[in-house]
């Protein structure tokens, strides 16, 4: 099968600079590699966002990357918003159509809403089925933001979200099929008018060869270790975790993510969080690592007794899944992918957000029972390997492709 994977603002060839340890670019590379391993030809179409990125390149056998010039590279933000991407959709979709007219794919898979807009425009009249995957829905983001409205560091609606809110339902209804990354997203898509029969749940996967219980472990200092991965912008959930830490004696917290370590002193969010930790009297038990490269995450995750998710909205729960794959139980809020991935009381704990006293109680209970943590860790590894390996995700993705190509025949 010839697969066209449209990812306007992601490329497995040249991952964007970013503050988080889990990037869409990396997952995209894993998915395409597994699809190619099963004998399919994959072409990733991405927007050229750096001057030194080649127009064409082979990622690995069976996977080619095409970077499309959709305007001046200098005008593309490092983390572009809706307005930046929407403005470039026509310049992105035109070349796509020309390429597909001469080299027609069997199926198109679009990642994110602007990619879907470009893919649908390019595939129009060519008879190519389009599979849409939103990765993140504005309706869910706005719901998460509403829960923390007017609180510092809360998720805020994108400046161009009006266009996104208006267009996401139309994109979902126009696609041949829609891939949801978690169960809650199915209900959100249905509320937008997307027919449930066209929706299939295919979560984001985990590299179970890299994220394993066995392997190097980051150095510890004798204290029980808690870890959270965040870009530091969502301060309110982090403040909740810091408050909980005051009631968990002799435990340390690693805050992984944000700008590079050398740039932390110049980061406003870091400064406010570090000051807050000092005010609480726990600065000596809180370490901000700054940005950590993807390959360096497994040793850190293995070194933690527990990983706590502080995300207000997390469609895929990627870092939580990575922790579980390393045998580290997760404490997470009941949002997005966590509701599917974390089995409450078996692989970790689901806990309501903004409840520092309850969080502290749960942390103390678990840290006082190392054997329970170990049991959760064993179950977590089994959960990830059986449900979230990229081999399985690729197989489920191909099942969606087979369905839409059969219907289009």
Where do the PLM segments sit?
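N-terminal subdomain of nucleotide-sugar transferases
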Residues: 1-63, 67, 408-409
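Membrane-proximal helix-turn-helix segments that form the acceptor-binding/catalytic region
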Residues: 138, 157-177
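Short alpha-helical donor nucleotide-sugar binding micro-motif in glycosyltransferases
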Residues: 172, 291, 299-304
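Carbohydrate-associated surface elements
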Residues: 184, 205
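Conserved donor-binding/catalytic core segment of Leloir-type glycosyltransferases
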Residues: 218-236, 242-248, 254-256
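Aromatic "clamp/platform" in nucleotide-sugar-dependent glycosyltransferases that forms part
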Residues: 312
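Short hydrophobic beta-strand element within catalytic cores of glycosyltransferases
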Residues: 329-332, 342
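Conserved acidic donor-binding segment of nucleotide-sugar-dependent glycosyltransferases
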Residues: 344-345, 349-356, 365-370
